[in-house]
C-alpha cells in the first residue's frame, strides 16, 4: 500500500527558472506465507518428455506473517533552467525505514530501523531545440531478496539494499519519432546462495553486481496510423567480492548480453477506433548457473492483439 502527497510550483530567482516539487509519502509492504511443504515425488530429465507425477493432496500449513516493511519519506525535485540550452535537476528523498521479519512462530527475526537519503541529479544540454545531451546520477532503495527453500536460512527475507546508477545519453526528436542512445552503469548488492564447506547453502548479501550497458531506442509515430516502440541493449554484468571465485569473472546468471524489443500499434483506416497490436521480445543466450557452466539458449516472444476505443 502506498500514499503520496505532493505540491508543485514554478518561480524565478533572477534569470533562473525553477520547477519545484515537494512532498511526502508512506509505503507499507507485508508478506504472509504458508510454511513450505517439500516432499520427494520423483525425478526426470528436462531433455525428455516430462514425467506425470501425482500432485500433493495433503493439508496445507497455516499462513503467518513473514514481513512487515514500512517506509516514510520526504522528497523534493527542482528542475532549474539557466537558459534555453542548460538545465539541471536536483532532488532527493529522505526515507525512514522500519522493517520487521518474523519466524514460523511469529517471533521477530530481524528489526531494521534506519534513515537513508537517496539523491538524484542530472545535467541537460540542448544545443538545438530537438537535441538533448544529458548525464544523470541516482541512488535507490531495493527490496531484499528471500532465501530459497534449500538454503540453511530458508525463506529468510534480507534487509533492503542500496543501488546506484549513473548514465549518460543523447536524445534526438526527428519528425514525430524520438531517437535515443544511453550508456549506463548500475551497482547493487549481490544476493545469492553461498556454498558452505559442509555442502549446504546460505542465502546472503555479499559482494557487488555491476551491470554496464548501452541501449538504443526509438519511439513515436512512423506514419499517421502506425506507432512504434523499439529498443536494443547490450549488457555486461559482473560480480565481484562475493567470496565465491567460481561465481565471478563471467556474465552474471540470468542476465543476457543482448536484449531487444519491437512493438507496433496500427490504427485500421476502415473502422474508427480499432487498432491491431503486435510485438516481439528477444533475449540472447544467458547463463543458467552461477558458475557459468550451463547456458540457456536465446529465445523470442511474439505478441499479437487488438484494441478498440470509443467515447460514451
Regions found by a protein language model. Give the residues of each.
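Membrane-embedded beta-strand positions of outer-membrane beta-barrel proteins
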Residues: 20-24, 90, 121, 135, ...
Amino acid at each position: 500500500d502506498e500514499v503520496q502527497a505532493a505540491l508543485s510550483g514554478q518561480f524565478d530567482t533572477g534569470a533562473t527558472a525553477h520547477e519545484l516539487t515537494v512532498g511526502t509519502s508512506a509505503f507499507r509492504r507485508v508478506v504472509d506465507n504458508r510454511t513450505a511443504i517439500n516432499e520427494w515425488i520423483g525425478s526426470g530429465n528436462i531433455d525428455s518428455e516430462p514425467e506425470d507425477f501425482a500432485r500433493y493432496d495433503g493439508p496445507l500449513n497455516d499462513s503467518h506473517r513473514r514481513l512487515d516493511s514500512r517506509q516514510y519519506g520526504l522528497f523534493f525535485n527542482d528542475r532549474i533552467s539557466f537558459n534555453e540550452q542548460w538545465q539541471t535537476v536536483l532532488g532527493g528523498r529522505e526515507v525512514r525505514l522500519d522493517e520487521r521479519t518474523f519466524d514460523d512462530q511469529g517471533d521477530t527475526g530481524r528489526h531494521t530501523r534506519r534513515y537513508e537519503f537517496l539523491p538524484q541529479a542530472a545535467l541537460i544540454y540542448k544545443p538545438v531545440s530537438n537535441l538533448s545531451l544529458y548525464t544523470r546520477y541516482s541512488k535507490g532503495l531495493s527490496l531484499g531478496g528471500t532465501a530459497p527453500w534449500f538454503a540453511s536460512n530458508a525463506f529468510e527475507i534480507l534487509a533492503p539494499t542500496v543501488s546506484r546508477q549513473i548514465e549518460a545519453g543523447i536524445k534526438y526528436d526527428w519528425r514525430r519519432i524520438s531517437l535515443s542512445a544511453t550508456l549506463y552503469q548500475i551497482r547493487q548488492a549481490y544476493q545469492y546462495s553461498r556454498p558452505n564447506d559442509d555442502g549446504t547453502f546460505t542465502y546472503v548479501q555479499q559482494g557487488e553486481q555491476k551491470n554496464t550497458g548501452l541501449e538504443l531506442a526509438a519511439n513515436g509515430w512512423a506514419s499517421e496510423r502506425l506507432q512504434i516502440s523499439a529498443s536494443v541493449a547490450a549488457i555486461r554484468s559482473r560480480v565481484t567480492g562475493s567470496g565465491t571465485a567460481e561465481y565471478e569473472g563471467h556474465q552474471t546468471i540470468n542476465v543476457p548480453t543482448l536484449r531487444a524489443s519491437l512493438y507496433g500499434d496500427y490504427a485500421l483506416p476502415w473502422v474508427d477506433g480499432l487498432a491491431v497490436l503486435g510485438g516481439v521480445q528477444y533475449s540472447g543466450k544467458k547463463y543458467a548457473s552461477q558458475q557459468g557452466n550451463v547456458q540457456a539458449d536465446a529465445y523470442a516472444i511474439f505478441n499479437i492483439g487488438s484494441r478498440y476505443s470509443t467515447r460514451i
